[in-house]
Structures are given as C-alpha cells and as structure tokens.
Regions:
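Acidic beta-strand-to-loop metal/phosphate-binding motif
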Residues: 76, 112-125
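Thiamine diphosphate
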Residues: 121-122, 131, 147
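Short, surface-exposed amphipathic charged segments that create phosphate/polyanion-binding patches used
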Residues: 25-26, 107-111, 151-164
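Cofactor-binding loop segments of dinucleotide-utilizing enzymes, especially the Rossmann-like FAD-
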Residues: 79, 119, 145
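Phosphate-handling DNA/RNA-contact segment within nucleic-acid enzymes
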Residues: 18-113
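Short, aromatic/basic amphipathic alpha-helical patches
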Residues: 125-137
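TOPRIM metal-binding catalytic domain and adjacent DNA-binding surface shared by DnaG-type primases
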Residues: 1-27, 31-34, 68-69, 104, ...
Length: 172
C-alpha cells in the first residue's frame, strides 16, 4: 500500500511481528552509524485506531543514522515512512520536533543545508526548528506540502518539491 518494493524492505530491514506486544505490526528498525539498533516503530498492519506503537524507551536518537551522509544536505521529516519514501539522506524525527541528539549531531557534523518537511499542522514547530538552525549558520529550506504527506506524494514528486523549495531566512 505504501509503495515500497523489495529493495526498500531489504534496505530498511522491515519485519513483521505475528505475536506478542507488537502483534500484527510491521516493524521498522532504525540503526545508528555503527549499524546497531537504536530505535524501532511498530506500525499496525490492519490500520486500527492505534496505528503506531513505540518501544518503552526514549526516542532521542538519530533515526536512520546508518543511511545518512552528513556531508550532504539532510532532509528532516516526521515519520519513518516519510523518510523511507524520500530515501536520500532523510531522517525521521519520530514526531514534530527535533530532539537534542539529532540537533547535536547536525551541528557537530557542520551540516550546511537542511530541508524541513513537516505536516501542515506542525508549521510552528518547523519555524522554531528553522530559527535554531539559521542561528547556527545552516541554510534551511522549508518544503510546503499543501496538506499532503511525503509518502502519499511519492519519491519523484517529493524530489521535485525539494528542488523547488527556497531557503528561509528571518529577514523577509
């Protein structure tokens, strides 16, 4: 349904849990830069009222760190499926705000360019994030989705939106 192929399933090491606390959930693992599991998300396979189930430990991690090239522009998105649909240097926030470890890693690695792609209900969060990064000297592009979701738009349309986005500053 989400448009992922066997290469995506293999790359992201997706799994399925058929019993236990994550019964009937697709498991989306996240790995740190050394390839060690640092977090995971369980997504209900049958679209119940409780779509996502997170593990009972803090999510202050760098999502999909294993796949990030810190010398290239990075793309910050809300969820794991958004990141997987964009693929290239895309990091899930596991929510609408940036947590300390990810923020620290961005600054530590002297990332020069960031694209922020959040749902329209997270506009204020995106502005706060943008301001923090601009104050660090990082160029930030805010990608407008017009009520759509990166996963719904698909890879090609998202890449077009990213390329057509403009840098933000607080002088305008």
């Amino acid at each position: 349904k989400r448009g992922f192929n066997s290469e995506d399933i293999e790359r992201y090491n997706l799994g399925y849990c058929s019993e236990g606390p994550y019964n009937n959930r697709v498991i989306i693992p996240s790995y740190d830069s050394d390839g060690k599991l640092n977090y995971f998300v369980g997504r209900d396979f049958y679209n119940s009222n409780f779509k996502y189930k997170n593990p009972p430990f803090p999510k202050d991690v760098v999502g999909f760190d294993l796949y990030v090239n810190w010398s290239l522009p990075i793309i910050l998105v809300e969820g794991v499926f958004d990141a997987m649909s964009i693929k290239n240097n895309s990091i899930p926030l596991f929510g609408k705000t940036i947590l300390p470890k990810l923020y620290g890693k961005i600054v530590e690695n002297k990332v020069k360019d960031i694209f922020i792609i959040l749902d329209s209900d997270a506009f204020d969060d995106a502005i706060q994030m943008t301001e923090k990064f601009v104050n660090e000297g990082i160029s930030v592009n805010f990608v407008k989705l017009d009520g759509q979701d990166p996963n719904d738009l698909g890879y090609k349309k998202m890449i077009t939106k990213i390329h057509n986005s403009l840098p933000m500053d607080f002088k305008q």
